[in-house]
Curated annotation (Swiss-Prot):
Family in the record: Belongs to the universal ribosomal protein uL11 family.
GO molecular function, one term: large ribosomal subunit rRNA binding
Lineage: Bacteria, Pseudomonadati, Pseudomonadota, Alphaproteobacteria, Hyphomicrobiales
Quaternary structure, from the entry: Part of the ribosomal stalk of the 50S ribosomal subunit. Interacts with L10 and the large rRNA to form the base of the stalk. L10 forms an elongated spine to which L12 dimers bind in a sequential fashion forming a multimeric L10(L12)X complex.
Protein's UniProt name: Large ribosomal subunit protein uL11
InterPro entries (UniProt xref): Ribosomal_uL11 (IPR000911), Ribosomal_uL11_bac-typ (IPR006519), Ribosomal_uL11_C (IPR020783), Ribosomal_uL11_C_sf (IPR036769), Ribosomal_uL11_N (IPR020784), Ribosomal_uL11_N_sf (IPR036796)
The organism of origin for this protein: Methylobacterium sp. (strain 4-46)
Described function: Forms part of the ribosomal stalk which helps the ribosome interact with GTP-bound translation factors.
GO cellular component, one term: cytosolic large ribosomal subunit
HAMAP family the UniProt entry points to: Ribosomal_uL11
One Gene Ontology biological process: translation
Assigned keywords, A-Z: Methylation, Ribonucleoprotein, Ribosomal protein, RNA-binding, rRNA-binding
Length: 149
């Protein structure tokens, strides 16, 4: 018989930097899950990923207090900032204050957008790469990025 699922926890955790402090500790503690077990497993799985990359993770909690977790690709905004050469660090660079008006926050090429769309394709809710490209283009414009050739 399959284990009974008691809930899901969605978090965005920096690669290789999971620790029991908020937001991870309280989110898992409420479900009665072993926080350190998750932190060790997550850090081991993300060891090969660039440290600090935000990784969306969905944790499935079971009635017997065990869990499984599934990692997704980093957010589109992370890929766009990286491709546009915007600062990514403790305090992430924000997009333009008024997208479409004034100076752009950065520049990104169509080729870079297609590459991001192909990477994110499994996580996006679309059928073709072209529709994924359109979604990424919209995100880039909303961030105040200028799309070139």
């Amino acid at each position: 018989m399959a284990k009974k699922i008691t809930g899901y926890v969605k978090l965005q955790v920096p690669a290789g930097a999971a620790n029991p402090s908020p937001p991870i500790g309280p989110a898992l503690g409420q479900r009665g899950l072993n926080i350190m077990e998750f932190c060790k497993a997550f850090n081991a799985k993300t060891a090969q990923i660039e440290k600090g990359t935000p990784i969306p993770v969905i944790i499935t909690a079971y009635q017997d207090r065990s869990f499984t977790f599934e990692m997704k690709q980093p957010p589109v905004s992370f890929f766009l900032k990286k491709a546009a050469g915007m600062k990514i660090g403790k305090k992430p660079a924000s997009g333009s204050k008024t997208p479409g008006k004034g100076a752009p926050a950065g520049r990104i090429s169509e080729a870079q957008i297609r590459e991001i769309a192909e990477k994110k394709m499994p996580d996006l809710n679309c059928d073709s790469v072209d529709s994924a490209v359109a979604m990424i283009r919209g995100s880039a414009r909303a961030m105040g990025l200028e799309i070139t050739g």
